């Protein structure tokens, strides 16, 4: 099973690269343009999709102007089953998304593999209404196999500006065994992480080729990193308060 999982993941990554390259490049272009124009990258996901928002936040080798939207009841640590129920509630997103600082110069990623639940859809609609360029990372196969739970009947891929298909199968799990009654071994986190990091890597090069110094975090475990990172945090702390919440930067 170990070999099979690695093989499946490698095949899956190649599938995404071959089918989504144009969309990946478009996303990278929009990220690059947003940062050059004073915007930031914002991300939102529920449940395990939320993991991806943390993967690219405050990340060694990653972009600095990245703001995850943390809504703890929609994560897993305050009750996993409850978080799934909340994600299915129409209009719940209005309790938090309207208070977020989302601007027309921003790019906003919404992460949901099934793409059917109301909260991610409402978040995408709100970000779009505020003028941000919206990008979904979702599975078209999965989405089209299940009815929407949103009151409009729409799915996530139908309400955003750009769709990056992660090509995950319905139910996310890719392995089977005669003695196991349900599919197992999910893929969406591995694939989603690769998609985001690839998009950001391309955006970094686009900025550099345009003569702009890309805002990149250096690993905090490398000597001199604190000084390097401090100036970037100072630049973006107003737009991304979670960078410094609970910590007073030394002058």
From Swiss-Prot:
It holds the Pfam family SIS_2. One of its GO terms (biological process) is carbohydrate derivative metabolic process. One of its GO terms (molecular function) is carbohydrate derivative binding. It comes from the Bacteria. Residues 31-214 form the SIS domain. SUPFAM superfamilies: SIS domain. PROSITE patterns: SIS. PANTHER family: PHOSPHOHEPTOSE ISOMERASE, SEDOHEPTULOSE 7-PHOSPHATE ISOMERASE / DNAA INITIATOR-ASSOCIATING FACTOR FOR REPLICATION INITIATION. NCBIfam families: PRK02947.1. Belongs to the UPF0309 family. This is UPF0309 protein GK1441.
């Amino acid at each position: 099973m170990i070999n099979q999982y690695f093989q499946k993941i490698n095949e899956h990554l190649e599938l995404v690269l071959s089918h989504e390259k144009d969309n990946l490049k478009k996303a990278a272009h929009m990220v690059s343009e947003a940062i050059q124009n004073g915007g930031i990258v914002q991300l939102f996901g529920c449940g395990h999709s939320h993991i991806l928002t943390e993967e690219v936040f405050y990340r060694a080798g990653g972009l600095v102007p990245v703001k995850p939207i943390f809504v703890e009841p929609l994560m897993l640590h305050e009750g996993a089953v409850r978080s799934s129920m909340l994600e299915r509630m129409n209009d719940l997103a209005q309790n938090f998304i309207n208070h977020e600082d989302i601007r027309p110069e921003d790019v906003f990623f919404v992460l949901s593999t099934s793409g059917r639940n109301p909260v991610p859809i409402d978040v995408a609609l709100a970000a779009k209404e505020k003028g941000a360029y919206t990008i979904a990372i979702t599975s078209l196969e999965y989405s089209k196999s299940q009815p929407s739970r949103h009151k409009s009947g729409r799915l996530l891929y139908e309400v955003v500006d750009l769709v990056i298909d992660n090509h995950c199968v319905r139910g996310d799990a890719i392995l089977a065994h005669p003695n196991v009654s349900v599919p197992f071994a999910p893929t969406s986190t591995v694939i989603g992480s690769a998609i985001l990091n690839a998009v950001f890597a391309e955006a970094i090069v686009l900025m550099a080729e345009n003569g702009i110094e890309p805002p990149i975090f250096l690993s905090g475990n490398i000597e001199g990193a604190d000084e390097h990172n401090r100036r970037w945090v100072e630049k973006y702390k107003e737009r991304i308060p979670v960078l410094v919440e609970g910590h007073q930067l030394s002058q």
